[in-house]
């Protein structure tokens, strides 16, 4: 059975932000965006909440293993420990699917001595490898393949884009 797919517009993303932002209370000392999916939602949250201390993390998992749960993460980019220590840090990604990436980042940020909270646009509890945990804040629960407006190529085979005609 083919997986359900949702192609979102910028209006959809704005509506998700309208649901997500009121959940977060108090000031954050830092915002850590997970590349690539967390860059745009992270920027939107930082702007809306006036967070100016913005960091990025990039994590890669080996694709060579057949059991993806056994893949060991490689940090391609991560802030120095001193930039996180004793701070309230909001970690942002677009989606919590398997949870591998964001959970890996959570562990490393906590090891630096930070207080961590997480925010995603979409949470997929049915796909999560971490059944006892999930994001602190999320805008929607889904089981669909989500295609965000900034992902013009991913998952779009055969899907017409609104307002565009083929050349």
Where are these regions (language model features)?
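PRPP-associated nucleotide enzymes
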Residues: 1-167
């Amino acid at each position: 059975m083919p997986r359900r797919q949702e192609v979102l517009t910028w209006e959809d993303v704005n509506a998700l932000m309208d649901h997500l932002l009121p959940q977060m209370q108090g000031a954050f000392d830092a915002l850590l965006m997970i590349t690539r999916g967390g860059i745009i939602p992270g920027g939107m949250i930082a702007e809306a909440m006036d967070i100016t201390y913005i960091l990025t993390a990039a994590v890669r998992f080996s694709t060579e293993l057949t059991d993806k749960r056994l893949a060991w993460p490689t940090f391609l980019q991560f802030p120095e420990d001193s930039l996180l220590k004793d701070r309230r840090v909001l970690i942002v990604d677009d989606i919590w699917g398997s949870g591998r990436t964001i959970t890996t980042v959570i562990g490393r940020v906590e090891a630096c001595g930070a207080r961590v909270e997480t925010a995603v646009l979409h949470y997929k509890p049915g796909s999560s490898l971490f059944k006892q945990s999930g994001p602190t804040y999320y805008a929607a629960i889904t089981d669909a393949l989500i295609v965000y407006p900034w992902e013009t190529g991913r998952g779009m085979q055969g899907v017409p884009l609104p307002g565009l005609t083929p050349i």
